Amino acid sequence: MKIHILPIEIINKIAAGEILEKPANAVKELVENAIDAGSTSIKVELEEVGRNLIRVTDNGVGISREDLPLAIEKHATSKLNTKDLYDISYLGFRGEALHSIAITSEMKIASCFNGEGYVIDAQTKEVKPHHIKCGTLVEVRKLFHNIPNKLRFLRSEKTELSSIIELLNRLALVNPNIAFELISNGRQVFDYQTATQLKRMEQLKVLGKEFVENMIHVKHTNDGIFGELFLGLPTLTQKRNNCLIFVNGRPVKDSVISSVMRHAYNDYIPKNTYPIAVIFIRVHNNEVDVNIHPNKSEVKFRDPQVIRRFLLSVSSRSLLQCGRSTSTTVADRAVEQFNQLLKKQTAFRKETVSKTTESGFFQSPKAKKAIDQSQEYAKQFEGKRNLDFDQMQNNNGPFHFSTDQSEEALPLMSHKKTSEDYSNKLPLEKQQSPSIFLHDNRDTSFLQQQLRKINHCEHLQNEKHFETFGKFKCQVHGTFIITETENEMIIIDQHAAHERILYEQMKKSITSPGQNLLTAEFVPLSEKAVEILSFNVEKLKEIGLVVERVSHCAVMVNSLPEAFKNVPTNELIEDIASLLEEEIEPKTLLERIHANIACKRAIKANHNLTREEIEELLTLMEDIPHTGQCNHGRPTHIRLPRKEIEKLFLRS
């Protein structure tokens, strides 16, 4: 087969195919042109997700009549000259986009410059006067009509529209000073008005409402780098590495920044999850190369280590400040689960009452009289339930409170009440009438109420109040600790909290040198484990662990780090051999070992604690950083606002 030169038409279509893979690419190029033109308002209209129509309208500076024919020529641009190649400040610069779109569609461009409007047909190159009064309007019809192969590879309308929405959201996110509107098949998808950066994030909900409510916002400048970071709390994670990254106003994918952010969160989130973050970086244009990808979606930093150090420093310090914070999504999920449970219980009660009514239980005259009387008492009681004990004593109303002392039981008692506990509390005839409606023994009841009030006050004087976690109230199921503040109830997972405390305490000893053992310890292992340890002898020495191979299935341990002195050596060495299979750095290895030890040594569920032990745990949670999540990224506590609890009981 002879070599021949391709026709220019085929060459152009091949080149256009590299730039335009799908409708979203065409939308991207047109919207970026509008941004570069200084627009403050951009409107995108679609029909059949761009296959039939893409119309982009802006209020930018416009294109003059003389420049309109040049705008659709290949490599024609107003944004770049020879000496600017390494100082690119615009989103578009190659002069390829409009030419590629013109080749693959039927395109018209109308623009107003200095009060004069003109339109050009990209196919005929004819320029005519136009009524446009401001900015530029680009209309693209029948995209890919002359490249059938492209049409065949387009995905469903829903998928293609999602790509366009994601693209526009990212451009809107980094340009909050520009209003964006998207209309698809005559339906408005979104309309974002100009806003501050934070307000724009709330408008977009790109990462969800939860992210906006559970993030750390930090700005920092150093070494010619400006960074604005929105970092999700450690308990807010995702399964994909999908941080939103913007460099010099350009949405990009960058492996350096992504890896830095994962490393910054390494100490706080589970192994196979990723942080949620939005990163804005600005550097001098000659410090970053944006001309390495056809769609300009990747960049290359001149000195990536400088960027790495900057981001790692800023994000690490910011995460330190979040301390005991845990995301509100945890509480939201809890309230949602409570609501679901409440619906089920309410449905069950309605069904039970319905069946009881049908059985004729409430049909007897005595039953009806009792119900009427109860309702009358309830009306009198309503509005008086906030009275104190003295007011109640002087009131002539037909009620007083029960003197049942069961609710004053010690908080740490875990005795499970049975039906016998309740049935034996009162004689049968007393059980048949609610204590709230009793009329007799008023004086005795009042005396008992006052005694309870005095005892309760003495008990309150002994209660310890914690700044963050309020007052300790009780332990539930030997697993959860309940505290309360003025406006919240807090549920603490004692194992998760203690695990994090132990881990943070052990981290302080990371730099401690290894200690020689008085007697070297012989540890039998599998052949594979011995091979792994032998291969990593030098790495282990860096963390103060000295091991020596003595056979194909055993090692001798001569020195251990201080933090491991109370850990069974054979168990420790087995864990280390397992971790070393991942080829991790010494510092990360030590952190993983500490995390494993902390998990094993922390107090377990179903373990009753004394008040003193619980108060000590709460004190440590207040004093030690990062107690908002355990070593695996799970929350150590959730906060249920009082208002949400009241809603569960329909008190709102």
Curated annotation (Swiss-Prot):
InterPro entries: DNA_mismatch_repair_CS, DNA_mismatch_repair_MutL, DNA_mismatch_S5_2-like, HATPase_C_sf, MutL/Mlh/PMS, MutL/Mlh/Pms-like, MutL_C, MutL_C_dimsub. It comes from the Bacteria. GO terms for molecular function: ATP binding; ATP hydrolysis activity; ATP-dependent DNA damage sensor activity; mismatched DNA binding. Keywords: DNA damage, DNA repair. One of its GO terms (biological process) is mismatch repair. GO terms for cellular component: mismatch repair complex. Disulfide bonds: none annotated. NCBIfam families: mutl (TIGR00585). Belongs to the DNA mismatch repair MutL/HexB family. This is DNA mismatch repair protein MutL. It comes from Neorickettsia sennetsu (strain ATCC VR-367 / Miyayama).
